[in-house]
Design a protein with these regions (language model features):
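Glycine/proline-rich low-complexity spacer/linker segments in large multi-domain proteins
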Residues: 1-47, 400-417
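Hydrophobic helix-coil surface modules that form long, contiguous segments used
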Residues: 22-26, 35-182, 211
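Exposed aromatic-hydrophobic patches
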Residues: 79, 379-387, 474-481
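Zinc-dependent metallopeptidase catalytic helix centered on the HExxH motif
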Residues: 171-227
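Amphipathic alpha-helical substructures
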Residues: 255-343
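Beta-strand-rich binding/interaction modules
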Residues: 329, 333-395, 448-454
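C-terminal outer-membrane/trafficking sorting elements
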Residues: 417-427, 431-496
Length: 496
């Protein structure tokens, strides 16, 4: 059976006092209340009635409809949730909390109560950061659209687990850092307003919440802080953001893929689309008639992005969500005999090629210029035309909009030994009769007639291909294997 979650319904203690709390994501709601436990099938409303001894306080989703003293020193709490809600976002927490309130004034002047329920012994340490929540809502409302549950509340309630959980309208908190607060608040839009339709697409929750942290970082620290945030949340390893088998919490809540790389996808989309189109897309995604207060897949989000930007993003989503790894760029440049600046960009990775716009920054005599080139193959040259200067430096993606590695191969700043002759994987592979082989020979090598020898798996010579090399650019040639036996072949690139 599926692992249901992180404990579901918990009878706990804090400072020796009984403490009940729930955490149902991903599949734990079924453990403690009868429900159709599917994130795409939201309940249209919910009432939760809790009777418990005083001075315990019961906290749950939505608005407190009534609080009634009962015989025997007990209290009845009736919470009412009237926005659609996924089962895993339903929450009960009880403890004799200290409570304080604040207020957020919405974009149209409506007031939203902010309620904070904290352990008495934690009050002093959490108060300052919790009180920043109002400003965070203001920032997110401006970027994402209005807080989605204005008719009810937002707040925090402490519970007995580390980290946090974005229960609808009331985040359960096991910490109090600004970034945890921003993360769980961001989920109110991305996870609660629009919920991933299945946990295959959990990045639509967690990657977006990670991105929300970066937006708060940008607000308090500016552009450099935003860039540094992403530098500190990189992931270069294997695995796809799309969760192939969402059966366990470790598969679903992969911090590197669902969170960090998922957040990077949004950061890169921002770079590809530009701020106006990107944030317009987020607002449209959160207000879409079919997705708001409902659920979405990666394809749904892609369609909104394409509609708002006018871009074809099929390759972007295929390579970053369903593909693995990242591009490894090698940049070289030269001044031609005609005084033209030629920039060459290789993708040197052994896996998929990435199609991305790349910013190039040219620095000369204290002056800088930035241009954007479209890059989608193993080797591409860009002729920038006649120049009357020699660049002091040329930088690829200087503002770090792409998850990548960069190697600089320019003759002016690299040793000749660091130039790489590269042969890329043949494609298609497997193939029927013909396959294409691409290679790159930097112009520092005097090889004008490279040869590719082809051997079978036993090392027997099978065929030879040769062609003229072109200075500072990649070459592609086709091997026609008609009549050759099926099997595995080895390619050997030689430069005379």
């Amino acid at each position: 059976p599926l692992a249901t979650g992180f404990g579901s319904f918990n009878f706990d203690e804090h400072e020796g006092i009984p403490h009940v709390w729930t955490l149902s994501e991903p599949y734990g709601a079924r453990d403690w209340w009868p429900c159709k436990d599917d994130p795409s099938d939201k309940a249209d409303s919910l009432d939760i009635v809790i009777i418990l001894p005083s001075p315990q306080i019961a906290v749950s989703n939505g608005k407190l409809k009534e609080q009634i003293d009962m015989p025997g020193g007990k209290i009845k709490y009736h919470w009412s949730e009237r926005y659609p809600i996924s089962t895993y976002l339903v929450s009960i927490t009880t403890y004799p909390y200290i409570k304080w309130v604040d207020e957020y004034i919405g974009l149209n002047g409506d007031a939203l109560p902010l309620e904070y329920y904290v352990y008495p012994d934690h009050y002093n340490q959490v108060y300052e950061n919790y009180s920043k929540t109002k400003e965070m809502i203001e920032v997110f409302a401006e970027k994402f659209g209005e807080y989605p549950f204005m008719g009810e509340k937002y707040g925090h309630v402490e519970f007995g687990r580390g980290g946090g959980m974005e229960h609808q309208t009331i985040s359960s908190m096991g910490g109090y850092s600004e970034w945890l607060i921003a993360h769980e608040l961001g989920h109110q839009w991305w996870g609660n307003l629009v919920t991933c339709e299945s946990f295959h697409h959990i990045w639509l929750n967690e990657g977006f919440a990670r991105f929300s942290e970066a937006i708060w970082e940008e607000h308090i620290g500016g552009q450099n802080a935003y860039i540094n945030y992403w530098n500190n949340h990189t992931y270069y390893g294997s695995g796809t953001i799309y969760v192939e088998e969402p059966n366990t919490t470790s598969q679903i809540f992969n911090g590197n893929l669902s969170y960090n790389k998922g957040g990077w996808v949004l950061h890169m989309l921002r770079g590809v689309m530009g701020d106006d189109a990107f944030f317009s897309t987020l607002k449209s995604y959160g207000s879409n008639d079919s997705l708001a207060y409902a659920s979405a897949s990666t394809e749904d989000f892609k369609l909104v992005c394409e509609s708002q930007s006018g871009l074809n993003l099929e390759n972007f989503f295929q390579q970053w969500i369903y593909g693995e790894y990242y591009p490894k760029y090698a940049l070289s440049w030269d001044i031609s005999e005609n005084q033209e600046l030629i920039i060459s960009i290789q993708q040197t990775q052994a896996w998929q090629y990435f199609e991305m716009p790349i910013d190039i920054k040219i620095i000369s005599a204290g002056q800088t210029s930035v241009l954007t080139v479209e890059n989608d193959g193993p080797v591409q040259d860009y002729n920038l035309g006649h120049v009357d200067f020699v660049p002091d430096n040329i930088l690829l993606d200087p503002n770090n909009w792409i998850l990548k590695e960069v190697e600089y191969l320019s003759l002016d700043n690299m040793n000749a030994s660091e130039f790489k002759i590269t042969m890329h994987p043949a494609y298609p592979n497997p193939f029927n009769s013909k396959t294409t082989i691409e290679y790159f020979i930097p112009d520092i090598n005097d090889a004008t007639k490279p040869i590719i020898n082809i051997y079978d798996i036993n090392g027997n010579f099978v065929d030879k291909i040769s062609t003229l090399g072109n200075r500072n650019e990649g070459n592609a040639l086709t091997w026609d294997a008609t009549g050759k036996a099926s099997g595995t072949y080895i390619l050997n690139l030689l430069t005379p």
